[in-house]
From Swiss-Prot:
Cross-referenced InterPro entries: Mg296-like_C (IPR027371), MG296-like_sf (IPR036340), Mg296_protein (IPR019097)
Pfam families associated with the record: Mg296 (PF09644)
Superkingdom of this protein's organism: Bacteria
Protein name in UniProt: Uncharacterized protein MG296 homolog
Length: 129
């Protein structure tokens, strides 16, 4: 795995492990509710085909918190294209986690836009905020 992508994954995972999970879960589900009004969902879309990070976190807290760590690892492997450059891999990882990162910022009590911008500067990704 590319070092910069690994550093980004570890940063997000460490930030996730530092926050109170129940508060994070509530914030994530609220962010997801707001975002779902802008998502295009087609009749033939299968719920199982959606990314883990675009589904509400509703079940057992222990299961979900351990699943988040597994899904972060899986996502990093999926976007780690050997032919792609480091920047595009990190950008894909960031874009898949935009809602997740926003929920982290809210849970930490940090301005969402500023948090995204700092992440962009630190890891060289183009942020949406």
């Amino acid at each position: 795995m590319k070092p910069q992508l690994l550093a980004l994954k570890q940063f997000v995972q460490t930030e996730f492990e530092k926050v109170d999970f129940e508060t994070f879960r509530q914030n994530f589900n609220r962010c997801l509710e707001r975002e779902q009004s802008t998502l295009l969902i087609y009749e033939d879309d299968d719920y199982d085909d959606q990314s883990f990070f675009l589904k509400p976190m509703l079940s057992d807290a222990f299961f979900i918190s351990s699943e988040v760590v597994k899904q972060l690892d899986l996502l990093a492997v999926l976007v780690d294209n050997p032919k792609g450059d480091v920047k595009s891999c990190c950008q894909s990882f960031y874009e898949a986690l935009t809602l997740f990162i926003s929920a982290l910022a809210i849970t930490k009590g940090v301005d969402v836009g500023r948090y995204h911008q700092q992440l962009g500067k630190r890891f060289g990704v183009l942020t949406v905020y």
